[in-house]
Amino acid sequence: MEKLEKLYEGKAKQLYATDDPEVLWVEYKNTATAGDGEKKEDFTGKGRLNNLITTIIFDLLKKRGIDSHLIKRVDDTGQLVRKVNMFPLEIVLRNVAAGHFCSRLGVEEGLPLKEPVLEYFLKNDDLHDPFVNDDDLVALGVCTREDLAEIAPLARKINEALIEIFAKIDVKLVDFKIEMGRATDGTLLLADEITPDSCRLWDQKDHSGKVEHLDKDLFRRGLGSIIPAYEEIEERLAELAKSEGIEVAE
């Protein structure tokens, strides 16, 4: 498969055409950003780790009946993915109060939520990805009621699967954001990535109750390098994947 012209560049990834019109090449970058891109730094090895982590998680989800756009990992920082028509939407699932949820509702970080909270944010850099509800999305033509009737249960299914996956490696899944799109045949697919960039992950190995971040909050809050945490997540996920018979790149 040949990588052709660049189609798009975001904060964490680049997207390229290939010689197959139904296949795209995703290239993971070493850049970490926070605060709508105001804070920015390169971390050597981050792109490789996020490529590995997303590949492993998508493979684990596939074993649990959840399909994604991933075809395969092709090198350290590259993936081949199915071309999908993306919804311009960040889909957020929250299991524990943290981040924007706390500042918006005045609750303490770490509060366990009585049930998972599903939220939508419109992807719009100029508006800082505003929080929107179902009616907003339908009124703006972002998606239909029928789309939402598929998106919401799939998002909740992904949440349940990820809670189980991360619990097996002694990590609490606090919250995460995902994206979805439709393949050319109309199938709704999980797309984009699932990495410590897009999740809040708290280490539970010592069972002390103390919060130890294994995610991009280390960068957001100036708590140190993200690389050791990302390496730890990749190593634990790789061991889990191998135990489930999934081939993992060394």
Swiss-Prot record:
The keyword Nucleotide-binding applies. It catalyses: 5-amino-1-(5-phospho-D-ribosyl)imidazole-4-carboxylate + L-aspartate + ATP = (2S)-2-[5-amino-1-(5-phospho-beta-D-ribosyl)imidazole-4-carboxamido]succinate + ADP + phosphate + 2 H(+). Its EC number is 6.3.2.6. The keyword ATP-binding applies. SUPFAM superfamilies: SAICAR synthase-like. Pathway: Purine metabolism; IMP biosynthesis via de novo pathway; 5-amino-1-(5-phospho-D-ribosyl)imidazole-4-carboxamide from 5-amino-1-(5-phospho-D-ribosyl)imidazole-4-carboxylate: step 1/2. GO terms for molecular function: ATP binding; phosphoribosylaminoimidazolesuccinocarboxamide synthase activity. It comes from the Bacteria. Keywords: ATP-binding, Ligase, Nucleotide-binding, Purine biosynthesis. One of its GO terms (biological process) is 'de novo' IMP biosynthetic process. InterPro entries: SAICAR_synt/ADE2_N, SAICAR_synt_PurC, SAICAR_synth, SAICAR_synthetase. Pfam families: SAICAR_synt. CDD domains: SAICAR_synt_PurC. Belongs to the SAICAR synthetase family. PANTHER family: MULTIFUNCTIONAL PROTEIN ADE2, SI:DKEY-6E2.2. This is Phosphoribosylaminoimidazole-succinocarboxamide synthase. It comes from Bifidobacterium longum (strain NCC 2705).
